């Protein structure tokens, strides 16, 4: 019984092997018959004057990189090309029902479709793949390729920018009289387009011209549109007699701003608002100018970082560059104002006299507008009632805060009748004169101290004034500059959302 089952398995294996061999033999015979008199250098057209139609279909696999400095987009694509070659048709009945044959593309004629806006030395497809032959004569060739195409980068709204990149394909040799390149799309529309010379061209447009069914989402870019256009263009410099057809695939890319917002925009905004703290720092600390210079150095580092990201262009200034320039101007002004404030703070009565307009503006008007009040005024109000003596005797008590009133009190005091009748001895007179002299010195010193305090208060008022001005300027400048980007108000959803894998769509990264 066991031997019977082994024999049955061996018999089934032999039958399957014979069928497989017969199938391979039919395919081999078909291949030999097709290649006997086939010339792969000849254009497979039924008439020498009739153009051969090539249908193109681009399937985007991945956007590998968009290099802003070199202005190059690198992407992985599958370029599907379909045409009819009557010399490669057959009757499946004569070849054991074989209706599809796979052959190396080097063995048959293939169109010389190249990337016109190529950015490296590989203009055509170099990967060796097989073409699919159908018994009707239809040939399909869909090789994978990694293309580097030139893409003009617009840095006006960086890092909240959109870029328009394209891939332009066409035949390098055959004009429209010999090769007609068509869009392999079900829905097409036709429109007129005026070129730079004012010539009206008929353009075929496919709104969904790029297949995204196998697209792997980019971590930096969202796809907003994928239009394909077919044009016929003359090249007067080389071939003015006839036009050449090209198919251009446009990719409108919108940058995902999370990375640059966290690593570039937020630090810039933070550095900008650090400028305000310069005016809150006391002048006696001696670190006001140091803080200004430190902020200026930090902004310079960000400028150097920005030049490594964006292309060196003189056409426009990026949005973040405008904001950095605005912040640098603010920091420079803060350095100037800080130097003026420090100069006022350390002025003395022996070098500078305070003008009357400075007293009116900085000691009376501005403090009221800025809701500032000097603590010394409270002490003066408290001791105003203690200036006059109550008992008519000599008032020798020292002022709680200043001693400038001592001399006046001595001169203006009402002397006791008994003391007035006494004979003043020379030691008493000398002592009295010394007391008056000391009182004058103390009064002068007190006056100088008051002038010093007035200059310091002027510097404090100036700091408070520019603290308010710079706070408003930084806030308004940040809002006006950064919120001008159009993409911040673009509510369109990326069209590649529906093609993203389930694991990326179900667990989006939130900020």
UniProtKB/Swiss-Prot annotation:
Complex and partners: Component of nicotinic acetylcholine receptor. In muscles, composed of 2 non-alpha subunits lev-1 and unc-29, and 3 alpha subunits unc-38, unc-63 and lev-8. In cholinergic motoneurons, composed of 2 non-alpha subunits acr-2 and acr-3, and 3 alpha subunits unc-38, unc-63 and acr-12.
Residue runs in coiled coils: none
Disulphide linkage map: 151-165, 238-239
Membrane topology: Multi-pass membrane protein
Cytoplasmic-side segments: 345-464
One term of GO molecular function: acetylcholine-gated monoatomic cation-selective channel activity
Keyword Transport among UniProt keywords: yes
UniProt-annotated location(s): Postsynaptic cell membrane; Cell membrane
Deleted gene: phenotype: RNAi-mediated knockdown causes a resistance to nicotine-mediated paralysis.
Protein's name in the database: Acetylcholine receptor subunit alpha-type unc-38
Chain ranges on the Extracellular side, renumbered to this chain: 17-261
Glycosylation sites: 124, 202
Signal sequence range: 1-16
Alphabetical keyword list: Cell membrane, Disulfide bond, Glycoprotein, Ion channel, Ion transport, Ligand-gated ion channel, Membrane, Postsynaptic cell membrane, Receptor, Signal, Synapse, Transmembrane, Transmembrane helix, Transport
UniProt-listed NCBIfam families: LIC
Family per record: Belongs to the ligand-gated ion channel (TC 1.A.9) family. Acetylcholine receptor (TC 1.A.9.1) subfamily.
Function per UniProt: Alpha subunit of nicotinic acetylcholine receptor (nAChR). Probably acts in cholinergic motoneurons to regulate presynaptic neurotransmitter release, thereby ensuring normal level of excitation of cholinergic motoneurons during locomotion. Involved in nAChR sensitivity to nicotine.
Principal localisation: membrane
Listed PANTHER family: NEUROTRANSMITTER GATED ION CHANNEL
Transmembrane parts of this sequence: 262-282, 291-311, 324-344, 465-485
GO cellular component: acetylcholine-gated channel complex; neuron projection; plasma membrane; postsynaptic membrane; synapse
A biological process from GO: chemical synaptic transmission
């Amino acid at each position: 019984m066991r031997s019977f089952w082994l024999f049955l398995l061996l018999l089934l294996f032999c039958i399957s092997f014979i069928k497989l061999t017969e199938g391979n033999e039919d395919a081999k015979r078909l291949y030999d018959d097709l290649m006997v008199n086939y010339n792969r250098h000849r254009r497979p057209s039924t008439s020498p004057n009739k153009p051969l139609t090539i249908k193109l279909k681009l399937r985007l696999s991945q956007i590998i990189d968009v290099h802003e400095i070199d202005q190059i987009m690198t992407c992985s694509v599958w370029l599907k090309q379909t045409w009819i070659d009557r010399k490669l048709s057959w009757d499946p009945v004569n070849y054991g029902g074989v209706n599809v044959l796979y052959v190396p593309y080097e063995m048959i004629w293939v169109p010389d479709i190249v990337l016109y806006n190529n950015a490296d030395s590989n203009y055509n497809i170099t990967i060796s793949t097989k073409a699919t032959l159908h018994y009707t004569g239809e040939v399909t060739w869909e090789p994978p390729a990694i293309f580097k195409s030139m893409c003009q980068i617009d840095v006006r709204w960086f890092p909240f920018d959109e870029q328009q990149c394209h891939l332009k394909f066409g035949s390098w040799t055959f004009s429209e009289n010999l090769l007609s390149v068509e869009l392999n799309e079900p829905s097409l529309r036709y429109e007129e387009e005026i070129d730079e010379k004012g010539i009206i061209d008929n353009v075929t447009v496919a709104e969904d011209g790029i297949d995204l069914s196998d697209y792997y989402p980019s971590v930096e870019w969202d796809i907003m549109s994928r239009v394909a256009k077919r044009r016929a263009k003359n090249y007067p410099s080389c071939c003015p007699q006839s036009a050449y057809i090209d198919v251009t695939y446009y990719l409108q890319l919108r940058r995902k701003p999370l990375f640059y917002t966290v690593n570039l925009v937020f630090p810039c905004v933070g550095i900008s608002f650090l400028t305000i703290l310069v005016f809150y720092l006391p002048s006696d600390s001696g670190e006001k100018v140091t803080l200004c210079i430190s902020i200026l150095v930090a902004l310079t580092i960000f400028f150097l970082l920005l030049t490594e990201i964006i292309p060196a262009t003189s056409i426009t200034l990026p949005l973040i560059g405008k904001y950095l320039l605005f912040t640098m101007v603010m920091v420079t002004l803060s350095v100037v104002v800080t130097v003026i404030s420090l100069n006022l703070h350390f002025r003395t009565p022996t070098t500078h006299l305070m003008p009357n307009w400075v007293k009116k503006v900085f000691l009376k008007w501005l403090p009221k507008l800025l809701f500032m009040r000097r603590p010394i005024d409270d002490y003066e109000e408290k001791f105003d009632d203690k200036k006059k003596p109550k008992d008519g005797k000599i008032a020798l008590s020292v002022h709680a805060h200043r001693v400038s009133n001592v001399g006046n009190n001595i001169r203006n005091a009402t002397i006791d009748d008994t003391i007035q009748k006494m004979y003043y001895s020379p030691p008493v007179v000398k002592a009295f004169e010394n007391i008056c002299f000391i009182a004058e010195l103390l009064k002068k010193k007190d006056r100088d101290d008051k002038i010093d305090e007035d200059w310091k208060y002027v510097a404090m008022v100036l700091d408070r004034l520019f603290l308010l001005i710079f706070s408003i300027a930084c806030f308004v400048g940040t809002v006006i500059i950064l919120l001008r980007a159009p993409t911040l108000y673009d509510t369109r959803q990326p069209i590649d959302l529906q093609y993203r894998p389930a694991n990326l769509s179900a667990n989006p990264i939130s900020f």
